[in-house]
Amino acid sequence: MEKMPLISVVMPLYNAEKFIEKAVESVMKQSYRNLEIIIIDDCSTDDSLKIALALAEKNENIIVLTNENNMGVSKTRNRGIKEAQGEYIALLDSDDVWKEDKLEKQVSLLLNHEAQIAYCSYGFINENDRPIKKPFIVPERTNFNKMLAKSVISCSTALIKADLLKENLFDPNYYHEDYVLWMQLLKNGAKAVGDNSVLAYYRQVTGSRSSNKKNAALHRWKIYREVLNLSLFKSVYAFVSYAVCAVIKYYF
């Protein structure tokens, strides 16, 4: 039987002492077994690093790296991506979790459709692991033009071919660095396929970046005009679609 390709799970870590164990546990429980977990601590001021090191002592598949200075999430993810040895790279934030069959389903998607990016639907949980709001259900296909109207790929749901991601890292100059990356990959011909079942859960914590929407709209407009070089008309169309989707996703 052909050996399953290695998947590298890249997890940036910053002050997530309450959730890092649950995030790692959701990876260790995956039905897909050929994994390495790369945790990169970005100068946490709580016990996050201590917990990560304790987890690594118990499992040889866990690698813990530490930044000498606080680098921010984009550069921290990039460091993990560069260290990854797998044929595929999955991204997971240290306060989010996966369902047990997430990676197995996504590897099959990539292989069956000869695609480079897999994504999935996701739910929302609070600090106590309780579901909040309706899950975000994604379509089975997306492309550059569709992503202008509705962004359906996100970090903790994505599985990407490693060689593609290593050649196209996150740009730390943008607030929505993940959206910039997906759009550039799709614009350059990458194929993305989705699983509309809920395979991941985003944790919304008061005061966290994911729950802070200030200035997000301004940054998204900047991406349309300065990064993607869209016309004014197309930028307005994309921005209105983005605003409507954001309201629906986070408030209903």
Predicted regions and their residues:
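Conserved donor NDP-sugar-binding/catalytic core segment of glycosyltransferases
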Residues: D101-I132
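Acidic helix N-cap motif at the loop->helix transition within catalytic regions
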Residues: F19-E21, D46-L55, V97, D101
